[in-house]
Design a protein with these regions (language model features):
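A polyanion-binding, active-site-adjacent surface
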Residues: 1-166
Length: 166
C-alpha cells in the first residue's frame, strides 16, 4: 500500500529494515513538520541526539539551524525537516551508498506528499536527493560544516538569507 499521509509513511520508516543501520540505533528519524509545508529542509542523517529523541536536528547542528532560521524570519514549525538517511550511522560517519539508496525512496515519497515549493538540501549527501519536477531545489552546506568552517558558515548564512528574500 502506498502511504497517503506523512503519518502513514512515518510508520513505514520506523519499521524499515532495508539496510543495516536500524540494528544499532534507538529510533528511526522520519522527519517532522506540517504536511502542507511550503519549505522542506533535508540533511544527511540523524546524529546521537536525534537518535535518542526520534526528531531531526535537535543537537548542536539543529540549534545552529534554528538560530539561522530565526534570523531570517523562518518559523521552524512551518517547515518540514528531515534527512535523506533516516537512521544514525555508526560514529556519525558519512552514509554508504546502499544506505542512501535504501532511504531515498522514503524521502521522495515524503516530498511527493508535501509538495513544498522549495527544498533546501544541506550537505553533499543530501544533494543526492531525487528531484521532483515543479519543486525548486537549493543546495547549501550542512549546518554542522557551517558551524566549523568560516567560509562554509558564510555560504550557509547567505543561502538562507537569499531563501528568505524570495
Amino acid at each position: 500500500m502506498i502511504p497517503l499521509t506523512l503519518k502513514d509513511l512515518e510508520e513505514q520508516i520506523r519499521i524499515c529494515r532495508k539496510c543495516r543501520l536500524w540494528k544499532a540505533t534507538l529510533n528511526a528519524v522520519p522527519g517532522e513538520g506540517p504536511q502542507e509545508s511550503k519549505l522542506a529542509l533535508v540533511g544527511q542523517n540523524p546524529g546521537t541526539e536525534e537518535d535518542k529523541s526520534g526528531k531531526p536536528f535537535v543537537g548542536r547542528a539543529g540549534k545552529f539551524l534554528n538560530k539561522v532560521l530565526a534570523q531570517n524570519c523562518i518559523n521552524r514549525e512551518t517547515v518540514f525537516v528531515t534527512n535523506i538517511v533516516k537512521h544514525k550511522t555508526p560514529n556519525n560517519r558519512k552514509p554508504f551508498a546502499d544506505e542512501v539508496e535504501a532511504c531515498a525512496p522514503f524521502l521522495q515519497r515524503q516530498l511527493g506528499i508535501i509538495l513544498p515549493k522549495k527544498v533546501v538540501l544541506m550537505g553533499a549527501v543530501a544533494w543526492q536527493t531525487p528531484r521532483i519536477k515543479g519543486i525548486e531545489y537549493i543546495e547549501t552546506v550542512h549546518p554542522s560544516a557551517a558551524m566549523r568552517f568560516t567560509k562554509m558558515r558564510k555560504r550557509f548564512m547567505e543561502d538562507f538569507n537569499r531563501l528568505a528574500q524570495r
